[in-house]
Amino acid sequence: MSYGWAIYEGTVVIASLSLLGWAGLWFLNRRLYKEYEEKRALVQIIFSVVFAFSCNLLQLVLFEIIPVLSREARMINWKVDLFCLILLLVFMLPYYHCYLMLRNSGVRRERASVGAFLFLSAFLYAFWRMGVHFPMPSADKGFFTMPQLVSRIGVIGVTLMAVLSGFGAVNLPYSYISLFIREIEEADIISLERQLIQSTETCIAKKKKIILCQLEVERNQGSEENQKRSSFFRRIVGTVVRSVQDDQKEQDIKILEAEVEALEELSKQLFLEVYELRQAKDAAAYSRTWKGHVQNLLGYACSIYCVYKMLKSLQSVVFKEAGTKDPVTTMISIFLRLFDIGVDAALLSQYISLLFIGMLIVISVRGFLTNLMKFFFAVSRVGSGSSSNVVLFLSEIMGMYFLSSILLIRKSLRNEYRGIITDVLGGDIQFDFYHRWFDAIFVASAFLSLVLLSAHYTSRQSDKHAIE
């Protein structure tokens, strides 16, 4: 019986990791790599492995509540997952990322290896020094221990999560509530489209002039060859005249090229403005449908929760409190105290906890992947380097993000579900610090996002579609 159960547990672990790895590979090739030809096999393998181990951490949180695996199997799975993920994040990814950048720059393989090793040494030193400024576990057992490494990764990952959450807490109501949706007239869009067409046609006409000027310069150079057969005096006069004409043509070409560049920039701005107005018009039309009304109500509900979260985070920062239960669990507890419906409060709380943790995990994964796609396309389109370098950087961020989410989700678990997580991560990790740090960065990010979105909304209302 025990042998069969061990086979079952091993099959579940291997199958889940394989499925998650395949999902990461599919996401990379179908959603990120779809516009790029450069596809390194090792980069794809690293991304899929980091994705699998990262999502497996969140899966193990669910396994703590749902008894799919035994305690021993979960403990082994936790340790192996954390060991492999930290090995990738702290050692392998920094080294290989630097090595690949040096190789892409034309550095020889031996020198690239030495340069990557030196970079890894500097990275580890900076990684160690980071712990001086934050509450860290005792270093009696050395630096390369699970609590030490997890604590430092947690600082970076929690900071990233707080920044994204702060922006989302402000941007989500702003995007959903119909109060902030503009009413756009079709005549305004048509007027801008005419400007765009006129700008494009003018740009094309000036490009044709540039080509004609270049052809004329080439003809003058050809006529210079024919003038060599003429008299000496005619050659001198012809040379002077052609020189003046060529200088004038080159000056005209430079002026035309500058005008074309300005017109292309104007056309780009006009196109973006037309696109934004079309989106705003579609959003206004959608807001008048029944789905739009539901989304509007959802926006107000999210606004209430986001305001509550911001106030609780501000309270945690100001009064240095460690935080309380999540609002959903609090509301359920109040409801059970007011209305006796004959339901076991402990049992209902357990199912509510499972549902809430599942929602946290789904929202966390979905939100991260959405921001991952936006960041990838934004960085890749401005030409910051090869797509392989961007994918390696995102792999590093992804692992830190999901590992840090465990430090925060742990507090939402009931005490009986925290045991293995606390033991594996390290009992002397300052878990409350990460919640206070998250709240501080969350409040700062939300406030900054509120200021920026308010300025954007004000400027948009004062001048809806003015383009200089």
Swiss-Prot record:
One of its GO terms (cellular component) is Golgi membrane. The GTPase activity is Mg(2+) dependent and is strongly inhibited by the interaction with GPA1. The gene is GTG1. PANTHER family: G-PROTEIN COUPLED RECEPTOR 89-RELATED, GOLGI PH REGULATOR A-RELATED. Belongs to the Golgi pH regulator (TC 1.A.38) family. Disulfide bonds: none annotated. This is GPCR-type G protein 1. GO terms for molecular function: abscisic acid binding; GTP binding; GTPase binding. It comes from Arabidopsis thaliana. Abscisic acid receptor. The GDP-bound form exhibits greater abscisic acid binding than the GTP-bound form. Required for seedling growth and fertility. Expressed in cotyledons, leaves, stems, roots, flowers and guard cells. Induction: Not induced by abscisic acid, cold, salt or drought treatments. PROSITE patterns: PROTEIN_KINASE_ATP. Residues 243-279 form a coiled coil. Keywords: Cell membrane, Coiled coil, Endoplasmic reticulum, Golgi apparatus, GTP-binding, Membrane, Nucleotide-binding, Receptor, Transmembrane, Transmembrane helix. The keyword Cell membrane applies. GO terms for biological process: post-embryonic development; response to abscisic acid; vegetative to reproductive phase transition of meristem. The lineage of its organism: Eukaryota, Viridiplantae, Streptophyta, Embryophyta, Tracheophyta. The chain crosses the membrane at residues 7-27, 45-65, 82-102, 114-134, 153-173, 297-319, 345-365, 389-409, 437-457. The keyword Protein biosynthesis does not apply. Its main location: membrane. Pfam families: ABA_GPCR (PF12430), GPHR_N (PF12537).
